[in-house]
């Protein structure tokens, strides 16, 4: 029985890994990088036109791009080569605080929507190495799922200033949660907080996905989930988002 159990476990892991691999490589993983480096950046530098991006900031090192999925979803991407959460560059002090820059760009959602979107409806997310389809770092700026919003509201007083397991998980997956102030988020990258504060995370950053959500007390919640093929968790923090923005119709 024990051998049979181990065999079944191995089969599950292999099937899960194969499924993730197919999902990841079934498209062009360099599509976003090509848009940034071959179109948006050259057009901005040569013609002062960011198209097809919404904004290009060469000196600050990032672009804002309207994603085709969802009416209000935008992406923040670097203007140079960074693959994703596994990149050592994200732990360098000179690297821009991409999450903070993404939060500052949330106004594009309101502009596209035609009305002010409350901060409580906005979320930021980046997927892990196996949880993404593109090999150019991109932070999703989009609406939060209404059920995730409700859960985080209910857990407001239970979320610590240290990385601790989020009560009840999220979307059936285990998450770590940490509360930070706006000042902390502005001054220190969530990538660094994860690498420096969660044991062994620094050596395995590519396994992690991260998300940032504003709370009703004006603090922020950092969320991190680690890849776990046994639980079919490919670490895609984008799962907390709803690109159809149903939360706006309920307000």
Swiss-Prot record:
<protein>
    <recommendedName>
        <fullName>CDP-diacylglycerol pyrophosphatase</fullName>
        <ecNumber>3.6.1.26</ecNumber>
    </recommendedName>
</protein>
<dbReference type="InterPro" id="IPR003763">
    <property type="entry name" value="CDP-diacylglyc_Pase"/>
</dbReference>
<dbReference type="InterPro" id="IPR036265">
    <property type="entry name" value="HIT-like_sf"/>
</dbReference>
<keyword id="KW-1208">Phospholipid metabolism</keyword>
<dbReference type="GO" id="GO:0046342">
    <property type="term" value="P:CDP-diacylglycerol catabolic process"/>
</dbReference>
<keyword id="KW-0594">Phospholipid biosynthesis</keyword>
<dbReference type="Pfam" id="PF02611">
    <property type="entry name" value="CDH"/>
</dbReference>
<dbReference type="InterPro" id="IPR015993">
    <property type="entry name" value="CDP-diacylglyc_Pase_proteobac"/>
</dbReference>
<keyword id="KW-0812">Transmembrane</keyword>
<comment type="pathway">
    <text>Phospholipid metabolism; CDP-diacylglycerol degradation; phosphatidate from CDP-diacylglycerol: step 1/1.</text>
</comment>
<keyword id="KW-0444">Lipid biosynthesis</keyword>
<comment type="similarity">
    <text>Belongs to the Cdh family.</text>
</comment>
<keyword id="KW-0443">Lipid metabolism</keyword>
<dbReference type="GO" id="GO:0005886">
    <property type="term" value="C:plasma membrane"/>
</dbReference>
<feature type="transmembrane region" description="Helical">
    <location>
        <begin position="5"/>
        <end position="25"/>
    </location>
</feature>
<keyword id="KW-1133">Transmembrane helix</keyword>
<keyword id="KW-0472">Membrane</keyword>
<dbReference type="GO" id="GO:0008654">
    <property type="term" value="P:phospholipid biosynthetic process"/>
</dbReference>
<dbReference type="GO" id="GO:0008715">
    <property type="term" value="F:CDP-diacylglycerol diphosphatase activity"/>
</dbReference>
<keyword id="KW-0997">Cell inner membrane</keyword>
<keyword id="KW-1003">Cell membrane</keyword>
<keyword id="KW-0378">Hydrolase</keyword>
């Amino acid at each position: 029985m024990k051998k049979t159990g181990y065999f079944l476990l191995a089969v599950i892991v292999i099937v899960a890994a194969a499924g993730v691999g197919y999902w990841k490589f079934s498209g062009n993983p360099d599509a976003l990088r090509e848009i940034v480096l071959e179109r948006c950046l050259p057009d901005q530098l040569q013609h002062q036109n960011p198209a097809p991006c919404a904004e290009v900031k060469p000196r600050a090192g990032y672009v804002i791009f309207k994603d085709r999925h969802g009416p209000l979803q935008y992406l923040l991407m670097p203007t140079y080569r960074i693959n994703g959460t596994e990149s050592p560059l994200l732990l360098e002090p000179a690297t821009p605080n991409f999450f903070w820059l993404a939060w500052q760009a949330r106004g594009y959602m309101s502009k596209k929507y035609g009305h002010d979107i409350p901060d409580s409806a906005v979320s930021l997310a980046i997927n892990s190495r196996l949880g993404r389809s593109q090999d150019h770092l991109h932070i999703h700026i989009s609406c939060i799922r209404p059920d995730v919003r409700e859960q985080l509201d209910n857990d407001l007083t239970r979320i610590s200033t240290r990385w601790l397991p989020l009560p009840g998980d999220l979307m059936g997956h285990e998450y770590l949660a940490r509360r930070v102030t706006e000042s902390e988020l502005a001054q220190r990258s969530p990538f660094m907080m994860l690498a420096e504060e969660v044991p062994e995370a620094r050596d395995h950053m590519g396994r992690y996905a991260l998300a940032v959500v504003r709370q009703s007390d004006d603090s922020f919640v950092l969320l991190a989930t680690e890849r776990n093929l046994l639980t079919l968790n490919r670490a895609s923090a984008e799962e907390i988002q709803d690109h159809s923005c149903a939360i706006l119709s309920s307000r």
